[in-house]
């Protein structure tokens, strides 16, 4: 088995440079897959020490682990959409931001949130070419009912996944448009 050594001092320097270049724009640390194999909690701790307090994960168990490890005030976005009632209830209990990628997602979440008498904090996922999930750019009209008629959903953000950002600039620019 291979072992990786992460120089957290260098990581902190890199994060400081990233924060400086972001010039006040919020940064989300994507820590899916156990922090990409480097450890969810240790990587979240380094990010928090550097000033990054927004985390994105793909599993409910990761949201729970962050909360149990004391990351209670930090924003945690569940990147993977879900219509499973048990997952939605737990995400609401954990005060997670929940991804909405379709009208079905929104309808189910609105119902679960209404049953719990809470308003779900959500981010809308737009599919700009990854093909995994999300509203297509041509489906923007489907977002209006979420804002207009779903009283138990609050939309606080919108995001996409530029899957080839570092290796295919032409495709990335096309996705962004």
Name these PLM-found stretches.
Residues 2-6, 10, 23-177:
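Active-site-proximal beta-alpha core segment in soluble small-molecule metabolic enzymes
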Residues 11-14, 18:
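Alpha-helical packing segments of well-folded alpha/beta enzyme cores
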């Amino acid at each position: 088995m291979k072992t990786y050594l992460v120089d957290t001092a260098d990581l902190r320097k890199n994060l400081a440079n990233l924060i400086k270049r972001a010039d006040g724009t919020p940064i989300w640390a994507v820590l899916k897959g156990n922090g990409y194999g480097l450890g969810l909690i240790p990587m979240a701790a380094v990010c928090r020490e550097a000033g990054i307090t927004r985390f994105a994960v793909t599993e409910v168990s990761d949201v729970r682990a962050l909360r149990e490890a004391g990351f209670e005030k930090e924003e945690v976005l569940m990147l993977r959409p879900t219509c499973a009632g048990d997952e939605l209830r737990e995400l609401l209990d954990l005060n997670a931001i929940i991804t909405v990628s379709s009208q079905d997602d929104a309808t189910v979440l609105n119902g679960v949130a209404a049953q719990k008498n809470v308003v779900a904090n959500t981010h809308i996922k737009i599919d700009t070419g990854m093909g995994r999930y999300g509203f297509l750019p041509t489906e923007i009209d489907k977002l209006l009912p979420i804002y207009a008629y779903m009283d138990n959903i609050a939309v606080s953000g919108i995001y996409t996944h530029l899957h080839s950002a570092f290796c295919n600039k032409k495709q990335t620019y096309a996705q962004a448009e």
